[in-house]
């Protein structure tokens, strides 16, 4: 800036200062240079803020404009957009605008319907999701349970003996999950099933299982099977309804009678062992029989005079103790012998006991019973002689609240005493303290006392006996099954009861092992027999499938919740789990005949079972196994259908030793040879697809091996793709009839064919350059033919109604261009 400019600026400043001084109302502001600089910076920043937005807009326009975008037009469009919702009126609706009002109402109704539908859809989806989660969780629980069960102590590997097994014709290779007890039981199950499948008279399964106990040399197991045989030795009435049979009075009376007989026989054996073990103290002599046995036993049990004894003695022993122990041994005649010897001291008891002894069901008449009970309440309730009180309570079935601990000091004695007091008739005259039903006794033992009272964890056989002798078979089995080392015994007791139709089964497979069902009488429990058997076999079905199959045969008449036969279902799962297809279901020989498997002896219609297993294998994605099984079942359609699915993904691959393609190729060729030799054919379209895929596999094998001319001959013979313009339309029309398995490989077929043509083209050009004497006309014709064939492939690829994979078309065009 020149001097004149500064002078003019100075003049203007002085003029401004003069004008400011002329205004006296305004105060003077004195600023130093720093304050003036700060004020100038503030003014400058305001100016930049206003201009920066314009500068940014200009820069954005330059950037986007270089990419062909009109930012001014875009800004206008963005400003014109409205944030109003779809169903909101853009303009306020006037009160008199009926059409607008109706439109709004209609839109609101639609919106409400959509919202309600959305809400219901989400609720339904949540419900389906919850149900699916519950089903999956139940399946996971079952798998966890089965896994835990299979990992128990008894699941340790057990080496089989070298001697041949009765259960299988050929010993199971490797290790077995069965222990020695389970092996012994499985042999008896094999013997039992063999008799049945061969049409022989059905043997007694209880006797077969009891023979296992003899070989085990275990007193508890032997007594258990003796008890099971005793309790099941009742008159079996054919009945479709097991529950009705089990709760009938006659059947329950028979159970009580058998239980008493077992307890009495056991006690008599105990007295014999005691007496013969202490002959010097017992002083056994006289006429052999229960009376002399009891007298000798009392010499050991009651060596000193009994305090509080009443009514004298017989041959030096308290009379009531003699009567009680004769009754405890189950010999009423011996007890009557004692009564006769002491009848003068016993009053009316002889008459009452004679009536009791002659009664078929060990029950006094109501009148006599009332007299005895009255006498007991008046005279004997507080008697000092415990044996006298016990005998009166037995004969009169009274005072059920007294446990007679001085006499019945063992669980077996207590049980025998209570079973003697059980009543079955509807006697309204009896007071509650004088009447005990079997259901009341069952409840007392199972629910009121329970496992802790009987120390069941330390004495499992005792608690099992308590439940079993009171006809609580299902609860007894379920308890014993929970004890790992005794599980095999529980399962085989259940099998014995099942065969005798004495077992109450759960109505649903999903029920717990022991359950109560609505509508059943009190104290009736049901056992989930199917689950029991499946849990037991789960441990060894993968290592010992033959043995597992023997147990599954017991389920041949059972159905699951969908009505499916449980035997077929279990066999299906067993085969897939163990993968022993040939051993269990049979094997197909080279001539197409079927070598029988283990299943043949159990089922008349093995084809149905094999088809079921094949279907399961197919559903699980085990297609190769399913093919073999469907071929066993002579279902050619399914064999070829699955083979087509297996071959389709691999036919274009390079064949290598032990590869998937090589294995599937050998499998397919073997099937084709068998079917051709035996005249077997499937449904026409499936059959044609199978043989076409085999031919395509041959084509690709020749192509990958470098045999170009052979591969060309194969593809020309198949007539799958056109090799001339005249055949394009025909091949496009035929393409619609091909299955998806063939269509999926079309890209590879076209590329391979074009590669063959291109290779032949290059070879032709090389031959022309190397042999100049060759007729030019022939070379030109061959060259033209190859280009026409390549053009036909390009035309075909463009006309077929199928989207080929990736860059197939581009690669085809590229090779065709190289040929031109």
Swiss-Prot record:
PANTHER family referenced in this protein's UniProt entry, alphabetically? NUCLEAR PORE COMPLEX PROTEIN NUP93 (PTHR11225:SF4), NUCLEAR PORE COMPLEX PROTEIN NUP93 NUCLEOPORIN NUP93 DEAD EYE PROTEIN (PTHR11225)
* Disulfide bridge map: none
Q: What is this protein called?
A: Nuclear pore complex protein Nup93
Task: Provide the protein's localization.
Answer: Nucleus membrane; Nucleus, Nuclear pore complex
Name the family: Belongs to the nucleoporin interacting component (NIC) family.
State the protein's purpose: Plays a role in the nuclear pore complex (NPC) assembly and/or maintenance.
The record's statement on gene disruption is:
Mutants can be recognized on day 2 of embryogenesis by the presence of necrotic cells in the tectum and eyes. Dye mutants die on day 5 of development.
Query: GO molecular function, one example?
Result: structural constituent of nuclear pore
List keywords of the entry alphabetically.
Membrane, mRNA transport, Nuclear pore complex, Nucleus, Protein transport, Translocation, Transport
Q: Which domain of life is it from?
A: Eukaryota
Got a GO cellular component term for this one?
nuclear periphery
InterPro entries given for it? Nucleoporin_int_Nup93/Nic96 (IPR007231)
Q: Where is the signal peptide?
A: none
In Gene Ontology terms, what is a biological process of this protein? protein import into nucleus
Question: What's the protein's topology in the membrane?
Answer: Peripheral membrane protein
